[in-house]
């Protein structure tokens, strides 16, 4: 039985933790995660999803900073043979990598070397990739450039959000991850160097990146919205010559509008407007459309600043938009 230390923080790491903890080939001797963080309006200190699951499973937890002497002491005391790391959120220094005899192995949510970096699933959707996947690779000092031990590829539907894609890859990748590290322990794993071609970097998507430019074509905006959902959330500014009602009776000359769901407008629908300028709004009985650099985009669900998420048509009726209202 291999002694394994697991490092991870968010929800996408939980399926892999569960898979290792319930596999008889492994003894999870410790779980490394980031410290409790303040969340919600009350800013209450809350454990990470991985820490919560580890405590539920009765596993020891290390939530210290990886460059501290206390962290190294705690890691060495585990006497782990091998380590799994997925979405931990901290860079592991060389002395930490060297402390585990068989090395550290990462489950990365792309087919490397495409989309190395922090946001592989998001970038795959934004780029309109027809396929993506998950790879298990050995961690080194470079950025996601180690040899690949296992890989899976899936087809994208063209309608998933990054949150949905990450959930799918986390679930489908977990059993592959476990089998790959078991093969490493047995000495039967095959290590394949990453090819030099197809290298692209998946830089983190910032809030400013998520702002929509309505002069882009509808398909590109649709991909941007899905890539930014749920985080950091695609958004735009709503403007009008007169004040905009904000559903509760208050008014503002402009407000931030988050676009939670949208789709390219159905061109076969006779109600779909054909000549909207970029950023121009058209409100129907059951639909809200926005002009783009190509064909209109239909808004499905939105969230105005300080308000709850709601159907776009319901929001538009309550907002009582002036004919001059637009987004930009």
From Swiss-Prot:
Identification of the protein by name: Methionyl-tRNA formyltransferase
Record-listed (6S)-5,6,7,8-tetrahydrofolate binding positions: 110-113
Repeat found in the keyword field: no
InterPro entries to which the protein is assigned, alphabetical: Fmt, Formyl_trans_C, Formyl_trans_C_sf, Formyl_transf_N, Formyl_transf_N_sf, Formyl_transferase-like_C_sf, Met-tRNA-FMT_C, Met-tRNA-FMT_N
Gene Ontology CC entries for this record: cytosol
Family: Belongs to the Fmt family.
Ion transport as UniProt keyword: no
Protein EC: 2.1.2.9
Function: Attaches a formyl group to the free amino group of methionyl-tRNA(fMet). The formyl group appears to play a dual role in the initiator identity of N-formylmethionyl-tRNA by promoting its recognition by IF2 and preventing the misappropriation of this tRNA by the elongation apparatus.
HAMAP family the UniProt entry points to: Formyl_trans
Catalytic reaction equation(s): L-methionyl-tRNA(fMet) + (6R)-10-formyltetrahydrofolate = N-formyl-L-methionyl-tRNA(fMet) + (6S)-5,6,7,8-tetrahydrofolate + H(+)
GO MF annotation list: methionyl-tRNA formyltransferase activity
Gene3D superfamilies per the UniProt record, alphabetical: Formyl transferase, C-terminal domain (3.10.25.10), Formyl transferase, N-terminal domain (3.40.50.170)
UniProt keyword annotations, A-Z: Protein biosynthesis, Transferase
